[in-house]
């Protein structure tokens, strides 16, 4: 199992705030197509872009709701208004994963309509929820969603293939803008390949605008992650060749970050550490690097000796 380094929320809030001015403004409620209504979660911010996208899917009176936002009071007001003005109901509530900005609206939703308490679905369900299995199908008039287990951003992460539109609800694996945070890089890369193999042109992300060319966006994501893996491996190879560090020429995570980015603040380093830690664990799982025992801060990583042919 990969060691998890705590995520530095404060730094990312500062780091990502610069891109807030570059992302498009999205209306609170948008009829994206005749089958998809997007309702923003009311939780806009540098980590969540324009806020969490929640989607009402279908064409009849009964709809599927994908995600529930963070639990902001504005979201339940907005979603209730849409339901009441259009005389529609929710048959299934599908949660892409456990993170609070996707599940936080569940209590308000149940308070609004207690009947929904038996209609909440999530992989690895919490108490009172129902499980989502890989390949499970949810149907309402005008919409057929098939669950696709795609761990990496989170272990329980689910995407949903929308058959009628040849589209994919991508959750947090692929965003409308920028890159997502990864919990397990090895699983994430496998999931990205799995998603790419679906060959779906359109993506409905959990954050950001609709993705009009999903295959191109996923190629960009995969290329970015692979570049970081190659970059870290090259640094460790250079360390061994130069005889830096000790023993096998290994480097600590701090030394790897220093080699990649130069002198940076502690906050920047804390923010970079989780993803780069995942890169190292992926390389270890691929048996390309090893590590010496020790605490996370003192652990030294090194290139494994290649066996002769």
UniProtKB/Swiss-Prot annotation:
Q: Which of this chain's residues are annotated to bind Zn(2+) 1?
A: 97, 99
Residues forming the catalytic site: 101
What induces this protein's gene, according to its Swiss-Prot or TrEMBL record? Expression is induced during late sexual development in the dark.
Q: What's the catalysed reaction?
A: 2,3,6,8,9-pentahydroxy-1-oxo-3-(2-oxopropyl)-1,2,3,4-tetrahydroanthracene-2-carboxyl-[ACP] + H2O = 2,3,6,8,9-pentahydroxy-1-oxo-3-(2-oxopropyl)-1,2,3,4-tetrahydroanthracene-2-carboxylate + holo-[ACP] + H(+)
Q: Does the keyword Ligase apply?
A: no
Q: Which SUPFAM superfamilies match?
A: Metallo-hydrolase/oxidoreductase
Task: Provide the residue positions that the database annotates as binding Zn(2+) 2.
Answer: 101-102
- Report the superkingdom from the record: Eukaryota
GO biological process terms on file: asperthecin biosynthetic process; secondary metabolite biosynthetic process
State the free-text cofactor note: Binds 2 Zn(2+) ions per subunit.
**Knockout consequence?**
Fails to produce asperthecin.
Task: Cite the InterPro entries for this sequence.
Answer: LACTB2-like_MBL-fold, Metallo-B-lactamas, RibonucZ/Hydroxyglut_hydro, Sec-metab_biosynth-thioest, WH-like_DNA-bd_sf
Q: What class of enzyme is it?
A: hydrolase
Q: Spell out the disulfide connections.
A: none
Which cofactors does this protein require? Zn(2+)
Which family does the entry's similarity section mention?
Answer: Belongs to the metallo-beta-lactamase superfamily.
Protein's job = Lactamase-like protein; part of the gene cluster that mediates the biosynthesis of asperthecin, an anthraquinone pigment. Polyketide synthase (PKS) aptA catalyzes the formation of the aromatic polyketide from acetyl coenzyme A and seven malonyl coenzyme A molecules. Polyketide is subsequently hydrolyzed by the action of aptB into endocrocin-9-anthrone. Endocrocin-9-anthrone is then oxidized into endocrocin by aptC. Endocrocin is likely to decarboxylate spontaneously to form emodin which explains why there is no decarboxylase in the asperthecin biosynthesis cluster.
The protein, known as: Lactamase-like protein aptB
The root-end lineage is: Eukaryota, Fungi, Dikarya, Ascomycota, Pezizomycotina
